[in-house]
């Protein structure tokens, strides 16, 4: 016995307590204490002045009994998952189970189900149930607990309890399987600290809380007009809410220590207390200095009396008296009394009923596979927790609705065939449709199921081929349907080789479609392309039927026939310079030409971005050796870029051209053809020709085009390029740039020259120091996929009209790296990139030929036209060089950039400077048949 009460853990009742309880006969009122606690022993009896033994350990489902002698009340304290200590124990168990991830939703559902089970037991074996709340407000989630308890009682317990209790001592509990409709009371352990603790204030709080609770219980049918059909009962005209306003149940030990410290620090001096006592001793009678007592304030006395009477015991005693007097259920709100349903049992009878109910509702649930003949009870044991998890069912139902809505949204919007991008967009729209309904913890699993169903629907004959084109557009044809030719559905507008006719081109999927087939097709529709003179580029000519593309190793992608590499020291450079001088005096043999050309085509790429300016020796002569310097250094060093037998000097901005001696011309005619080097007839170059590609490999088809579209007179610098001649140019961007080039002709010695040549034609070159002023018109044309064409007047500026053309404008174009891609100035929401597609050249009417050898640097490759002999352009003519539409290395496709920063236009590729040269006119050469031109036909020239 502790103080003035007994306490024990059910069912271990002490003998002496059992004897005392038996003496109560039929006047034992059982009060159940349930609710929340936040102390270590899970004790909710603090307001009653009771506590368990110090060695007590709280457990879920454990019941602690309290009995105060002299009363008729048996207090049954239920320890449940709503106690903070027990909830902490459950969390520790979940954390220790490392194999199962912690799920807060499942954990919360488990806590609630266990509490509902204990609440059901309390509602069946108690007359009064006191719900203890540690907060200052009513917890709305308690309404959910009452709803679940009512559902479980009506749908589960009432299906098997009446039958199973008939053969047990609990049969006296009648068909309702409980002692009565228990009266529910609410105990709030804390009162708002900022409110005055007077009778009026405390009563107001209690009345307001009673109104709130009553409305909630009535609204959710927890309390009805029929007490037998109600889960709980409420008293009529009696208080059922109690606020503990005057007693500090759980004092703050820290604050108490602070108060003790303050009292110690501010304790009055002991001498002052002794002096006060001496003064009081001199008084003639008691009360002379101060009155015997303070005057009594009636209001304060009333508050003190209210504080004395306002205890939880007095609050509970009034309801116990109703039970003992037999008017327990008659006092409920508007409820019809049900005679014979309220029972007061003696101690032994109650323990028998309690044992039966505890076994059925608590003990047996620990074994869900318990053998029983009652199917309803078996269903209760297996599915009780699942039936109470209504949120899970609710969320599952919402997710099912959202899943149906998402699938319908996906299927209704899905076309007959679509690609992965459309699939992702449709799936995103289906996800949004799902989220309009789907909620809760199961939403992620439902979304995964939605994605799986949509993906399966897409792959069921609706998936597109999605083979990427050379412009990175997927093929839109069905994947499962065989098709010989891919089609992305993207249409580009492009011009023909000569630029006169524009047409619609399908998105290319291979190099042949991009760089050859389209231009051959549109040439049949252009009345100019069929008439113009086309330069014939060298292509692969197979000798066997099973020819194939050349294979390139990953580690060594460059196939070289001869020695490669540039001189690494100064001595080697000097030796080569001597060799060049020797070659001027002697005729090169066929073997020397082959070795020299092979070596020159095997120059390694520079590792520095933008500095690989290896001018192909095939383009500028047989003995040219270039360093890996930048383009600016090459422009400033004329002696490294001129070919054998060429003299160049930068004197007064003039280019010096040394005219060939007649003897050398005759010797040149006897030289072998330019392509004397053997080329493969069984393997072809899969990509475009570049500076380090194998010299013996040729492409299957030409990717470049060089055509003479007419005489120079068809271009007027006053009007620019007319629409009927070159269509699609933007306004003001259709002008070529004039380029003035000063030449000084240096002739052979007079005697040797006059001995072999006579005639009027040579008279203007007879005198050394003859000067020529060449006017060349050059245009760098860019074209976007919408067919817009424009010229550029600088590497970073689009030509806006004749006012943009100045004297040095063309020099900025031909002597600088020109970007391969540039943003199109056309007004469009999308940023279309224009590509350098054509180079316009109007040659002068002079006794010289313009030589062109463009080189395009893209990535690690420097692409060339692939011609060993650089093309000579005829005099006084309009020539157009059409560049490749798509660039491809040995086995690597180089796609255009998706976006281009205008501040760094060269990142996508660029045209190297120094593509133009000038050479003496040779009437013996056929410019349109490069195969018949000698090896030195382009060797003697000066680079402009």
Swiss-Prot record:
Function as written in the Swiss-Prot or TrEMBL entry: Involved in nonsense-mediated decay (NMD) of mRNAs containing premature stop codons. Probable component of kinase complex containing nonC and recruited to stalled ribosomes.
Residue ranges, annotated region (Disordered): 559-601, 629-654
Acidic residues: bias regions: 568-589
Family: Belongs to the SMG8 family.
Bias (Low complexity) ranges: 641-650
Organism this protein belongs to: Drosophila melanogaster
GO biological process terms, semicolon-separated: nuclear-transcribed mRNA catabolic process, nonsense-mediated decay
Record's compositionally biased regions (Polar residues): 629-640
PANTHER family (alphabetical): AMPLIFIED IN BREAST CANCER 2-RELATED (PTHR13091), NONSENSE-MEDIATED MRNA DECAY FACTOR SMG8 (PTHR13091:SF0)
Keywords: Nonsense-mediated mRNA decay
Protein name in the entry: Nonsense-mediated mRNA decay factor SMG8
